[in-house]
Amino acid sequence: MTHYILAIDQGTTSSRAILFDEKGSRVGQSQQEFPQIFPDDGWVEHDPEDIWSSTLAVCRSVLKDTGIDAQAIATIGITNQRETTILWDIDTGKPVYNAIVWQDRRTSGFCQSLSDQGLSEKVQEKTGLLIDPYFSATKIRWILDNVDGARETAQSGRLAFGTVDSFLLWRLTNGKSHKTDATNAARTMAFNIHTQEWDDELIELLGIGDVLFPEVMDCSADFGVIDASWLGAEIPVNGIAGDQQAALVGQACFTPGMVKSTYGTGCFMILNTGDKAIRSEHKLLTTVGYRLNGKVTYALEGSIFVAGAAIQWLRDGLKLFADAKETQSLAKQALNDDSVYLVPAFTGLGAPYWDPDARGAMIGLTRDTSVADIVSAGLRSVCYQTKDLVGAMAQDGATFSSLRVDGGMVINDVMVQFLSDLLEITVERPCVTETTALGAAFLAGLQVGLYQSLDEIEVLWKADKCFEPTMEKGTGDKLYQGWQKAVDRVRTRD
């Protein structure tokens, strides 16, 4: 009998459900986009009910489309957009405010005040993170301070906090399970990555001590059982990881020194550092790669806020094309893309700049600039930002000769080839590019015995195509210098 794993991949712009067999082969998939809410400059929100309804819809859809009975699903794995913050009343199950998305910059002033108080060192030492609006803790504080009744609900012991995984788990189990995993907890700025516990000192300093925090589990664990009313059967949830850490597992980067980069709404490069929590001196993040059987594997991460979101903006905002698939053919038509730069700092700049007040710019436009040139500049902006991260990792002592890539953008051969040319290394694209969902499936499968070890998972990884550098030496460096000048023009801080 075939054992199936249902992977829920709740992302920034869409929710997906992917059904895998135990060999890691995709059996079926369903995806549904949901609205983005932009109430103010630099603010990004989601309606938690949209997150919930779209997730439930795709789970039901993939079962219907494949004809597979819910009884045949051995386990569920959840992976999710990280840092996005939801607070809900445990009595009603209803959120008290919209989900504040990881891209949201509304708390930049509060973050600056924390830095001015001299807390940067303490925060980085305990959490591995920099003080930034990106992370969950200051979003919690904003809701408590600005939403009528939120602090009173918290003080009465009824206000639960969760990242998206925790919120979905609560809903799926009808409020029986308030849990998260170590990778999601590590992105809140309230979790001590060394003790692997919520940090009471930071929580009190941030003024969020009245909120109910979820129990932190290994990435493979018994998180709870979903109510039969949702999919027609009681199914255990046995794997949870934030999307980028799930991709690290899906890419089988289990050996220290292995690195992957995921290209979705944003871009996230993660380097496995083994049992050592390496502190970056160049504005990278020290984080949890995964935690299994109580043992933590640490990672060094560079986070870019806008990657695929730049292409989405070119499509939906500027209406330069109707479908993202058109970008490959358009990029091939570009004639002036060497001189056109798009800096997609729509919600500030992430690593290694960490400038929340920077804003986007398009530089080098002339009367000859075409749609193809602008589209190519959008694709290249993702590669230039990746090189920013590679440079920061190199300064922290990391060396690597290859990079594993995944996510929706990497089906674009033109972009991936330019990435290889720019970095001057081999870039490997796996057969399964949606490795985020695959990683969640692997983690769930580990817990229920479908896989006995990470070694067993590693042999399932297969490369679809390896891209080797073809650009004339020195050309990439010249192009990158142009990028650095463009970035300097939008930065507001050193």
From Swiss-Prot:
EC identifiers of the protein: 2.7.1.30
Sorted UniProt keywords: ATP-binding, Glycerol metabolism, Kinase, Nucleotide-binding, Transferase
Sites where the protein binds ADP: 12, 16, 265, 308, 408, 412
Pfam families reported for this sequence: FGGY_C (PF02782), FGGY_N (PF00370)
Biological function: Key enzyme in the regulation of glycerol uptake and metabolism. Catalyzes the phosphorylation of glycerol to yield sn-glycerol 3-phosphate.
Keyword Kinase: yes
Record: residues binding ATP: 12-14, 265, 308, 312, 408
Cellular component annotations (GO), alphabetically ordered: cytosol
Organism: Marinomonas sp. (strain MWYL1)
Family: Belongs to the FGGY kinase family.
GO function terms (MF aspect): ATP binding; glycerol kinase activity
Catalytic activity: glycerol + ATP = sn-glycerol 3-phosphate + ADP + H(+)
Name of the gene this protein is made from: glpK
Protein's GO biological process: glycerol catabolic process; glycerol metabolic process; glycerol-3-phosphate metabolic process
Enzyme class name: transferase
SUPFAM superfamilies: Actin-like ATPase domain
Name of the protein in question: Glycerol kinase
NCBIfam families xrefs: glycerol_kin, PRK00047.1
Binding-site residues, glycerol: 82-83, 134, 243-244
Annotated metabolic or biological route of this protein: Polyol metabolism; glycerol degradation via glycerol kinase pathway; sn-glycerol 3-phosphate from glycerol: step 1/1
Alphabetical list of HAMAP family matching this protein: Glycerol_kin
Regulation: Inhibited by fructose 1,6-bisphosphate (FBP).
InterPro entries associated with the record: ATPase_NBD, Carb_kinase_FGGY, Carb_kinase_FGGY_CS, FGGY_C, FGGY_N, Glycerol_kin
Positions with a binding annotation for sn-glycerol 3-phosphate: 12, 82-83, 134, 243
